Amino acid sequence: MTTRLAVLILLLTAFGYASIAQQKQEEPTIPTATQWTLDAAGPVQRAAIGSVFLMHCPNARSKGTGFLLKNGLVVTNAHVVAGCDAQQMVAMPSSSGSAVHFSKMVKDEAVDLALLRPTEPQKGGLELGPEQDPQVGTSVSTWGYPLTYNGPSPLLSVGYVAGFNKEQQQPGSKAVKHLIVNGAFNPGNSGGPLFLSKDNKVMGVVVAKFHLYPPQVKNAITALSNSKSGFMYNATDEHGNAIQVTEAQVVAMVLEQFYVTTQVMIGEAISLSELKAFIASKETELR
């Protein structure tokens, strides 16, 4: 009897260890860098990090930021998803290494907003704030993936509301209300949530930053890009195809990259009223 009892105890112990090991394997692991960020962030900011995604479109080789709402949908800019359909878009949450895929997408280029429905329900999500504009001088922040930074956790950018503007994304389109922020918004931050620094309720969507170049300089760069004369060089386009470019086009590429990456501490965010109106008009299309 004693021997049988000992064997039974050993079997139960082994089964318990195996069950614990299996549970540990099934639990998603948080990347070390993300855990450092979570540990260092305050409780308000920490709650937002897990709902901010790195948005990537392999087909168009574009990237930006997106965020999960409480209703289960993901918001980003229309220009972040340009050239891709829902099935081609991939989102990487900071809370795990598991990619998020999408089944449906709607967008409005005039407002520069897009809504995507994940194929699998996602935990968490951010709330939209009150539709009252923040006062000039109010501290705001955003989490995102600027420039060539690809994570695993988003980076924090902070600033202050400096004013408001009406922006037309396309000729003849309606004017869209933007918040002007004196914050470091860079390519890659596009589509990220704009928060009041005191809480994690969404007050807008990061969309652009101001640049140094006046229109005449941009026109000169465009002319260089269209030049077909001069020395020819072998290069690779954004899709990996071999191409030939002229000397003038190489100069234009360098100037364009400088234009994109030059740090200017003024950015823009689509207002909350525009975001709410967009969601209300498009949400039913994702059901």
Description of each model-found segment:
Residues 196-287:
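C-terminal subregion of chymotrypsin/trypsin-like serine protease catalytic domains
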Residues 14-20:
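C-terminal segment of classical bacterial N-terminal signal peptides
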Residues 69-70, 198:
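A cytosolic small-molecule/anion-sensing beta-strand core signal
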Residues 68, 102-104, 161:
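Conserved hydrophobic positions within beta-strands
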Residues 21-68, 74, 111-113, 259, ...:
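N-terminal activation segment of mature serine protease catalytic domains
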Residues 124-180, 185-193, 206-220:
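Flexible, gly/ser-rich surface segments that form the specificity/activation loops bordering the active-site cleft
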